[in-house]
Swiss-Prot record:
Domain CN hydrolase: 4-248
Pfam family of the protein (one): CN_hydrolase
Broad EC category: hydrolase
Name recorded for this polypeptide: Omega-amidase NIT2
Modification N6-succinyllysine, positions: 68, 123
UniProt KW keywords: Acetylation, Cytoplasm, Hydrolase
Record-listed N6-acetyllysine modification sites: 68
Amino acid sequence: MATFRLALIQLQVSSIKSENLTRACGLIREASKQGAQIVSLPECFNSPYGTKYFPDYAEKIPGDSTQKLSEVAKECSMYVIGGSIPEKDAGKLYNTCAVFGPDGTLLVKHRKLHLFDIDVPGKITFQESETLSPGDSFSLFDTPYCRVGLGICYDIRFAELAQIYAQRGCQLLVYPGAFNLTTGPAHWELLQRGRAVDNQVYVATASPARDEKASYVAWGHSTVVNPWGEVLAKAGTEETIVYADIDLKKLAEIRQQIPIFSQKRSDLYEVEAKKS
C-alpha cells in the first residue's frame, strides 16, 4: 500500500487516570472513523508528567491501561501506538510505549532510552532519573504499510537512534513526546525536520495538549514531517487529533532523487548498533 493515514491524538491529560483512559479510547475510535490506520497517543497519556507522579500512576504491562488499548485496537482493527505510561517492573520504573496490532496483540514495548535530565538555568530543571530507569533496546514493528521505529520524547535528540532505525528499514519514526515551553519553541519542530531529512523518513510526534495549570506545561503542537522536511500537519495547543496521509511513493522518489544511502562513506565512518 503506497499511502496510509496516520493520526496523532493530542490528549488533554488530567490527574484522573480513568478519565484519561476513557477519553483516549474515545479519540482512538474517532480517528478510526476518519480512516486512520495507525494512531499514536502522547507521552504519559494516562498520568500527569512529573517524577512525583510516576510511582503512583505506574502499572505493569500488561495492566489496566494497556488492556484497554489492546481492546480498542481490536475493536477498531487498527495499529495503536500507546504513547507512554509509567511502567513498573522488577522494582524499577520505566517510561514505556506499548504498541498493539489490529487484533489486539502486543507487538512491541519501547522503554525510553535517554532519560530527560536537564538544567537550563532560570528556565527549567528536570531529572527523570530521580525515579525512572532507562530502557536498553531498539523498538520497531512491521505493518502492511511500512516498518515503524519508536522513540519517546528526549530520544529524538539522539541522531544515532534514528539512523539505526533507517538502517533497519524504517520509513516512519514515531516519537510520543512532551517538550516544554523552553525546549518546545526552540527545538521541537527543528529536531523533527532534522531527523526526517537526515534519514529520508517520515517523522511524527504526539504531545499532550497544553495545560497552563500543570506543574509541567507541555508544548503541544503534535506534528508530522515528510522526508523532504516539510510539515504536513501540525496541531495547536488544545486537545485535538492530527491527521496526515503518509505517501511512501513520495518517500521513494526523494530517496531516488537524493541517494544519500548509497553515497555514505562507510570507509570513513559508520553508526553501529551494539545490541540487536
